[in-house]
Amino acid sequence: MKLLSVRYLRDQAQQSFNRFPWVMIAAILAVSFANYCVEFASSSTNLFPFINGMLVAALGISLFFGIIIFAEKKKLSKKQKKVLEFIGLAILVGIYYTLPDGRSSQNTALPYYRFAIFCLCSHLLVSFMPYSKSKQTLDFWNYNKTLFIRTTIGLLFSLIIFVGIILALMAIHLLFEIEFEDEIFLQIFIFIIGIFNTWFFISGIPEDFKEIELENTFPRGLRIFSQFILLPLLTLYLLILYGYCIKIIINWNWPEGIVSYLIISVSSLGILALLLLYPYRNDKDEAWISTFSRFYYYLLLPLVLVLFLAIGIRISEYGITINRYLIVLLGIWLTFTCFYFILGFQNIKIIPSSLTLLLLLASFGPWGIFSVSENSQFNRLKSILSESNSLKDQKLRQEILWKTNRLPELEALENQNLNLSLDSTQKEEVKSIIRYLSEHHGLDKIDPWFSQDLHQIMLAIKNDPKGNRSIDQSRLYLETMGLDLSNKPYQKDYIIRAKLDRHSTQVSGYDYLSQFHLNQQDSITIYAGGKQFDLSFTKNRKGVRIQNGQDQVKLSIASLIEENQVLSASEEDTNISPNHLMIKSQDERYKLELHHIRYTRKQDKEVEINSLSGILLINQKERK
């Protein structure tokens, strides 16, 4: 066997780029935007343009790949191919402007929900569009087999390369004491998945489709995987779900909501297994495959009925959400698929094409996933507040008013006491709906209910470097409604870090050294010299209590902070010498060297410590 040369690999890479230029350009852009987001996630005031650019470019990888494959399969002219590529580019630009831009909500997860729908649609289109009019389903199967195998091998190679590079970096760190930022590992992973994996995938797609279509040997490993792994698992899951259905009938209990997700997962697993075994359906030695393929869809119908029953109960109680809408949509698709094959139709291309059509129809318009789910939860919230008389004439009857001249500090006007006429159940429902709307749609629709512009207040907090980053949109709106989760005023977090570069801890005079990290709810146990030492915060969270049996010592951390005048500093994140962050007990049995302090400054200027980390030194010798 002739070994691959560097020149051969270079030529293959160049050939792949020339064949799929827009695919690689999209991959390079997606990786560039993604690495920018990783690098500047904490410092950028608005990542939405870069997140949206990353997602749209990622969509372009599959979209342009599908366009080029479609053009090659249909033998379109260069001009027709350019027209399709221009249409694809226009679609991507249109999608970019439909993604959330940060105006209605600062939740950077929002664009990913729409991206997931479009991404699934584009991949499904790639799977069937080149063979949309072909009557040869085996050609369609062979084509998707090539895509599946190439994807699997590409991911495996990418994983091996990533692990190899990470091990190399770890070796450099251990042998040469060179430090690497944590972000570099994620950036390397993004580069490998985005650039190498994409390039490797497209380089293995034959230009001659006859080479794919005339393939009459099927991978033995794929058959073994489907027959001896997927099908036994599928049978087990079906037995579990049917056992649950029998339990429902015997106890006459309504099904739990989670069963909907299980049914969707099991149904999809079964359809995947049948697709992988499709070429063997007429094999005389494997007659059971044909029998199982026919009866599988009969077995699915009762489970689909349970799915609709379970999700219907959840919708009647809690309204429609994105997830519930998708479950209903997938339930409709499963019902259609079951009846299609039960009635004797055999074209497996209907599976991806029908799902793509449903997803595309549900991705836009007033009937779409996002509009219906937002309106459903908005109407639920409006109904709860109206019934409790908290909302009247589209205005909240009470709300906390904020001092705009104190922004980005969030400080309420004095002497405001809210008494919302909501019981505990209603309060929890309101909190849940506000969180959902904030995370998935934004809170624009409820802005008119308030007398103050909460959107501008939120922007003032987020865009100012001194703003409290822990305040998100849902928390601001709930606090304004008098429904703050903690029922405490907002407090700014301060951090003190020790400069540990080339620092060594002085241990003379002490017998034991132990590192520790202490949170508000924690108590830490340290064993030294056969004795037990318990560390915890004092009740007022101003210091640390060290207990050894009946012996107890308290060390004041608040006074240490005051002594170093850290509270007067304008910086929220302060770095000082570790020599200023040491404190001893009076009898010098204990010494704390603090490396990290997180605390809040209450309205009365008192310090309240949230977390500590550092080193505890213990001297067990008796002091005279």
Name every feature range the model reports, one short phrase each.
Residues 1-76:
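N-terminal signal-anchor module of multipass membrane proteins
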Residues 164, 291-344:
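Membrane-embedded alpha-helical segments of integral membrane proteins
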Residues 363-386, 390:
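Hydrophobic alpha-helical transmembrane segments in integral membrane proteins
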Residues 392-624:
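Extracytosolic and intramembrane catalytic regions of membrane-associated proteins
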Residues 26-45, 62-72, 84-107, 121-130, ...:
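Hydrophobic alpha-helical transmembrane segments and adjacent interfacial helices
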Residues 36-55, 75-78, 100-116, 174-188, ...:
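Membrane-helix interface and helix-disruption motif detector
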